[in-house]
Amino acid sequence: MTVPVFYSISDDFTKYAAVSLNSLVKHANPETDYTVYFLNQDLSGQHKQDLSDLGIQNVHVKFFHIDDDIAKLYNTELGNNLFGACTDSSIQYVAKMVKYIKDVLALDPKKYINSGMLVMNSKAFRDEHFINHFMNLLERYHFDCIAPDQDYLNEIGEGRILHLDPRWDAMPNENTKPLKNPGLIDYNLFFKPWHFKNVQYEDYFWQSAKETKFYNELKAELNNYTDAERADDREKLNHMLLKEDKTEQDPNNWTRVKEREAVKL
């Protein structure tokens, strides 16, 4: 069995991808074969080599922080579900976001998933023409969304999402205690350990970073990131949430469209 793994990165994200790939290699089952594909447009030759050098005999590099053998995740039985994902724990204590999910998306916030990590039922996507359905919705309504890809996936997949153990998409959240055994860490939105100190789960990132050639560069990036830049990141999050007021009044928001036609597959 070969487990395919896909990354989508630009050249400037190489150092972060290298930390993740190194962690994957360290936790890979030696009895399983893995092929890691990097989807890219502008990776330099040197960075391709840097990533290739991290491969081992059973992890081949072909161009959400991984702390377990992801073959366990890949082997999830999806049944008739379109994809498997974890509930988005990062929004449960954000009142504006909870209101947006209830009033604009007409979904249950406790079932709203994070799209940063998906186990996809590719056959169902093809057989049921998921992409055609998505493009039809996009072209007809172009919904104004706070989290575009995530909102579309939640809406189209409603009722056919397998909710996975939260350890497979552990997200830093100052309102909750960290999971004791995270399998995959998603440094969601703006609070990255290479920009902010004391980020939940940061130890996993730096432990893996030390084993790559980018450790000193990443540390320098953290130390050079200014308080003004951190304040700007926080303001970007607040700006995102302002969309809730606007979209609630939109005559073609998800709630109103769903009253007229089927959105989910």
PLM regions and their residue ranges:
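Active-site-proximal specificity loops/subdomain of glycosyltransferases
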Residues: N40-D67, K72
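A short acidic (Asp/Glu
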Residues: Y16-V19, Q46-D50, D69-I70, A95-K96, ...
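Short internal beta-strands
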Residues: Y34-D42, A85-T87
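A recurrent flexible, glycine/aromatic-enriched loop bordering the glycosyltransferase active site
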Residues: L105-M117
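Short, acidic, metal-binding catalytic loop of nucleotide-sugar glycosyltransferases
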Residues: S23-T32
